[in-house]
C-alpha cells in the first residue's frame, strides 16, 4: 500500500507519468504519544505507542502543555524540514482524527480542528456520515498514513487508499503529530 501511495504521489507530481520508485527521500518517523500533552481522559500505554480515551478523567495535574477541553494528544518527534511519514492503526470506532499541528497549537479552551488553528487533520466523524465512512467501519480496523513534505508545504493523507492533499503554510514553525480521540476510541502508532 505504501509503495502504491508513494507512486501515486509521484504520478500526480510528475505530470501523469508513473515512476519506477518512490519519489524523494521519505523518512518513516518512529512516532510516540506525548503523555504530558494528553487530555485527562486519555490513557497512553507505557511504550507510548497506543492511546485510548477511557471517557473518565484520570485526575492528572494540569500543565501548560496538556489539552484541557479537547480529547487530544500530540506526538513526537517534531519536524522543521524534509519529507516524513507515519502510520496509525484505528479500530471500528468513529470520532477520531490524525494529522499534524504546529508546536504552538492552542491547548486550553475550545479547539477547532482547522488549519487556522495550526491543525491539519483527517479522520472519521459521527457527524459526517459519508457512505465511504460507513464502508470503512464495516471492514473493521484500518490504517491512515500521514505524509509531510515540510519544504513544499504539503500534508498528504492516505486513509485506506483514499488520498487527500492539504497545502499548508508552516511559517518555519515545528510541526508535531496530532491526534483527536473520541470516547471509547483507541489509536496505535505503527
From Swiss-Prot:
Gene3D superfamilies: 2.60.120.920. It is found in: Secreted. The keyword GTP-binding does not apply. InterPro entries: B30.2/SPRY (IPR001870), B30.2/SPRY_sf (IPR043136), Butyrophylin_SPRY (IPR003879), ConA-like_dom_sf (IPR013320), PRY (IPR006574), SPRY_dom (IPR003877), TRIM/RBCC (IPR050143). Residues 128-190 form a propeptide. SUPFAM superfamilies: Concanavalin A-like lectins/glucanases. Expressed by the venom gland. Residues 1-20 form the signal peptide. Neurotoxin that produces dose-dependent hypolocomotion and hyperalgesia in mice. May directly act on the central nervous system, as it is 6500-fold more potent when administered intracerebroventricularly than intraperitoneal. This is Ohanin.
Amino acid at each position: 500500500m505504501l509503495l502504491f501511495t508513494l507512486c501515486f504521489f509521484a504520478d500526480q507530481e510528475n505530470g501523469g507519468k508513473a515512476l519506477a520508485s518512490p519519489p524523494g527521500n521519505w523518512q518513516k518517523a518512529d512516532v510516540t504519544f506525548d503523555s504530558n500533552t494528553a487530555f485527562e481522559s486519555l490513557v497512553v500505554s507505557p511504550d507510548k505507542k497506543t492511546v485510548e480515551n477511557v471517557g473518565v478523567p484520570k485526575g492528572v495535574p494540569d500543565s501548560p502543555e496538556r489539552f484541557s477541553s479537547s480529547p487530544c494528544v500530540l506526538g513526537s518527534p517534531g519536524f522543521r524540514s524534509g519529507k516524513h511519514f507515519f502510520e496509525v492503526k484505528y479500530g471500528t470506532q468513529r470520532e477520531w482524527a490524525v494529522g499534524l499541528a504546529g508546536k504552538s497549537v492552542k491547548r486550553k479552551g475550545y479547539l477547532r480542528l482547522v488549519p487556522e488553528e495550526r491543525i491539519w487533520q483527517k479522520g472519521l466523524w459521527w457527524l459526517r456520515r459519508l457512505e465511504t465512512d460507513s464502508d470503512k467501519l464495516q471492514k473493521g480496523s484500518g490504517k491512515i498514513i500521514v505524509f509531510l513534505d515540510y519544504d513544499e508545504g504539503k500534508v498528504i493523507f492516505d486513509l485506506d487508499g483514499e488520498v487527500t492533499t492539504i497545502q499548508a503554510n508552516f511559517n518555519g514553525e515545528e510541526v508535531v503529530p496530532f491526534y483527536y480521540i473520541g470516547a471509547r476510541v483507541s489509536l496505535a502508532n505503527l
